[in-house]
Design a protein with these regions (language model features):
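N-terminal binding-site loop/beta-alpha segment at the start of enzyme catalytic domains
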Residues: 1-83, 87-91
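Short, well-ordered coil/turn segments that N-cap beta-strands
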Residues: 3-9, 39-41, 66-70, 128-132, ...
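Conserved, mostly hydrophobic/aromatic
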Residues: 11, 28, 43, 58, ...
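Beta/alpha (TIM)-barrel catalytic core signal, keyed to glycine-rich beta->alpha loops juxtaposed to Asp/Glu
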Residues: 27, 139-330
Length: 330
């Protein structure tokens, strides 16, 4: 597999950017320390997460650790500007998600020059000399509307070329797209040479059909690694009320209620089922559930190895809740 990570569970850095709420600095740093103490050695972040706040906090939390002891991934496609602005920023469907982050303005830039600038900024905020894997962030419809294909064209002709060169020169280990949609990944596979993808919410217990149609089989064939972000689908599979970064609608809630009922009848924690389902596919290099509070990372690791009876998975399949093409945990 072209995405080689030290642990199959990583730490998703979005909560460090004050996602949904203003997280105190000591709590944010403690959540990273907890992840490290639990054995997690893969950390992901992005400039979008609080306009650089997540990167600053992650860098501070990891500063005392041997850089060779962990893998780090970050994202390009956005530049954090010096000027500040108030109110809701142009963040696509995630408009108010990081309203408690830093007030700096963020600008899209998927060019080769913008990619180099974004990496330089991230290295500085993270306080490190290298980033292992770089994801081109959000060249997709949920952020760019009907113009998303044009944006992806720029990204594949600019950022992808620059990152391929960096990989060849040994500056990074690999690159791919970091998106919430399957189609941009399929196009990137046809037109470029990515090492894998970070895809959020699209290979989960709740939503996996589209990924299984082409992306997952092709990734397996080419030895690419898929990092599954949002294995709890923004929290709805972990007892929360968010799906796709907003309050879940009635159709999604009804489907989750059926999943919960089946889980209860088999004495299964639905969170464990969600993590183990995503990890069961051979193309999945890691999952990165967000952990906004100390203790969550250790809990996620416990859930990922919890015993789940085969009868539960068979019941999901029989109810049509899991695709016949989806590998199930052993």
């Amino acid at each position: 597999m072209r995405i080689q990570l030290p642990t199959r569970q990583g730490f998703g850095g979005a909560p460090l950017g004050n996602m949904y709420r203003a997280i105190p600095e000591d709590e944010a740093l403690a959540s990273v320390a907890d992840a490290w103490g639990a054995g997690i050695r893969f950390f992901d972040t992005a400039a979008l997460y609080g306009a650089g706040l997540s990167e600053l906090r992650l860098g501070k939390a990891l500063a005392g650790h041997d850089r060779d002891a962990y893998a780090l991934s970050a994202k390009v496609g956005r530049i954090v500007l010096d000027e500040v602005e108030s109110g809701d920023r142009d963040l696509g469907e995630k408009g108010g998600l990081f309203e408690h982050g830093l007030p700096n303005r963020i600008a899209y830039d998927y060019t080769a020059d913008g990619t180099r600038r974004a990496i330089e900024q991230s290295l500085k905020r993270l306080g490190t000399d290298r980033i292992d894997y770089v994801w081109i962030h959000d060249p997709a419809k949920d952020f760019h509307g009907d113009a998303w294909r044009d944006v992806l064209d720029v990204a594949l002709g600019g950022a992808a070329v620059a990152l391929t060169r960096m990989r060849e020169e040994g500056m990074i280990k690999g690159w791919g797209l970091g998106v919430n949609r399957v189609e941009p990944c399929e196009i990137a596979l046809e037109r470029s040479d990515p090492d894998g993808f970070l895809i959020a919410g699209r290979y989960t217990l709740l939503d996996h059909e589209a990924a299984l149609a082409q992306l997952m089989p092709k990734a397996s064939e080419r030895g690419l690694g898929i990092v599954v972000g949002g294995p709890y689908n923004s929290g709805i599979l972990a007892g929360g009320e968010h799906y796709e970064y907003q309050i879940a609608g009635p159709e999604v809630r009804a489907r989750v209620d059926v999943l919960k009922a089946l889980a209860r009848s088999h004495q299964v924690d639905l969170r464990a089922a969600a993590l183990q389902f995503s990890l069961a596919h051979a193309a999945v290099a890691a999952v990165i559930p967000g952990a906004s509070r100390p203790g969550r990372s250790a809990e996620n690791l416990r859930l990922a190895s919890a015993q789940i009876p085969a009868a539960f998975w068979q019941a999901l399949r029989a109810a049509g809740l899991v695709s016949v093409d989806a590998p199930l945990p052993a």
